[in-house]
Regions:
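Generic structural "secondary-structure junction" signal
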Residues: 13, 20, 37-39, 61, ...
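A broad, structure-centric signal for solvent-exposed, well-ordered loop/edge residues
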Residues: 27, 44, 151, 193-194, ...
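A generic short-segment signal for beta-strand/edge and adjacent turn/coil regions
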Residues: 1-6, 25-26, 34-43, 135, ...
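Linear, non-domain "peripheral" regions
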Residues: 1-118
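Secondary-structure boundary elements
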Residues: 74-76, 83, 93-164, 172
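Hydrophobic/aromatic-rich core segments of domains that either
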Residues: 15, 168-226
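A broad, low-specificity signal for short, low-complexity segments enriched in glycine/proline
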Residues: 27-35, 145-147, 164-170, 178, ...
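Short, flexible coil/turn micro-motifs enriched in small/turn-prone residues
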Residues: 46, 157-159, 184
Length: 226
């Protein structure tokens, strides 16, 4: 993973907080890992509250470019999108009550959730089946189209508009899933694309806590889930 920052004028001072080191857990093991930095020096190597490894680096004097490269090898277990039981110190039950301006449910979101509550009463569905139906419904209602929304667009607004991108799909999904009683969270990263190593933007998807499975991933924009 390589990131390059270029400046027209050298910054007087800049600090980067890097979270570029994978975690060792039940689904993956680090075989080797390193971070190369040009234009900065590492000032601190520590861990955050969630046990993610963090590097703080400070710019050197009179630089116009910073290049940060992280690389290594991992042994990964294929879990089909199921991350498993929580490793965070925050009780997962609390996440169903967490909200923000992006995921605050309005009239449109509440109408969507009411529709599903009525559907779920009629059918004997597992939680996984319910959430897959929700994901498909959102993608059908909100067509993927760039340029119609921004990083400031809320779930309610994008659902009303009928267009959006991955972050909009996730915000709608989170708002709806939480109203349905499911703890759920926003995940950002990269979508693996064939025949390309350079990506212009990051990707977003959701994870929902399902009893007896743990955290389960739902990529609403691409219709990918267990």
């Amino acid at each position: 993973h390589k990131t390059i920052f270029r400046y027209d004028n050298p910054p007087l001072s800049a600090i980067q907080k890097l979270r570029l080191t994978p975690r060792n857990d039940i689904n993956q093991k680090i075989l080797n890992w390193d971070i190369d930095i040009k234009g900065c020096s590492i000032e601190l190597d520590t861990f955050d509250y969630h046990d993610n490894r963090i590097h703080l680096c400070k710019t050197k004097d009179d630089i116009n470019e910073i290049e940060i490269t992280s690389y290594g090898r991992l042994k990964i277990k294929d879990t089909n999108g199921i991350a498993g039981e929580p490793t965070s110190n925050i009780p997962y039950e609390l996440i169903k009550f967490m909200s923000s301006d992006y995921t605050k449910p309005g009239k449109k979101i509440k109408t969507l959730v009411s529709y599903f509550k009525n559907q779920f009463k009629k059918e004997n569905l597992s939680d996984l089946e319910k959430l897959n139906l929700l994901s498909k419904k959102i993608l059908n209602e909100v067509k993927y189209l760039k340029g119609k929304t921004s990083t400031k667009t809320s779930a309610e607004d994008s659902l009303s508009l009928g267009f959006g991108v991955c972050q909009d799909h996730v915000h709608i999904f989170l708002a709806s899933a939480r109203l349905l009683g499911f703890p759920s969270r926003y995940v950002s990263g990269y979508l693996m694309l064939n025949n390309t190593n350079i990506q212009e933007a990051s990707h977003a998807w959701a994870e929902v806590y399902i009893e007896n499975l743990g955290w389960v991933g739902f990529d609403i924009s691409n219709g990918i889930s267990p």
